[in-house]
Design a protein with these regions (language model features):
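Surface-exposed, charge/polar-rich loops and edge strands
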Residues: 1-152
Length: 152
């Protein structure tokens, strides 16, 4: 287990109101990574599990944008809107809640289910149909699901 510090903002829970999902203005969240965590994230032989979609976004932002010395800590802001088609750089698994419709968090899950392709929605609908049929609880304090990234 390795730590990252993330200042989650209210924007995480702001629903998408734009006509086109891609036009949604994404909020920024500050994060901090210590050198040990950076080293683990940069090691391609490691299997990485992110707890929560905000951690997924933080890790992916770090891997895509940070080229600082691995021996020094990183403080940055992630303003990354992950949606299909998105190819993940460093998260292999994600433990996350069942999110409400119209959220950026749900878009991230759809992208995780269809790496690099725009077709994560059918699989997402199948999973959520089963969750509704089995009375799973949704949103931040509800039930969770473990997602495995299907590397291409």
């Amino acid at each position: 287990i390795h730590d990252l510090t993330l200042s989650v903002g209210l924007g995480t829970f702001r629903p998408i109101k734009t006509e086109k999902v891609k036009d949604h203005p994404m909020h920024a969240e500050e994060y901090f990574l210590d050198p040990t965590t950076k080293s683990v994230l940069r090691d391609p032989s490691r299997n990485r599990l992110a707890i929560g979609t905000t951690c997924v976004r933080t890790i992916e932002h770090y891997l895509a944008t940070d080229d600082s010395d691995i021996k020094s800590p990183t403080r940055a802001e992630a303003q990354l809107f992950i949606r299909p088609p998105f190819s993940f750089l460093g998260v292999d698994h994600s433990l996350t809640n069942f999110h409400l419709p119209g959220s950026t968090l749900l878009c991230l899950v759809a992208a995780f289910l269809s790496p690099g392709k725009p077709n994560g929605l059918p699989m997402l609908k199948k999973i959520y149909t089963e969750a509704i049929a089995k009375d799973y609880r949704f949103f931040s304090y509800g039930d969770a699901c473990l997602l495995r990234y299907a590397h291409n």
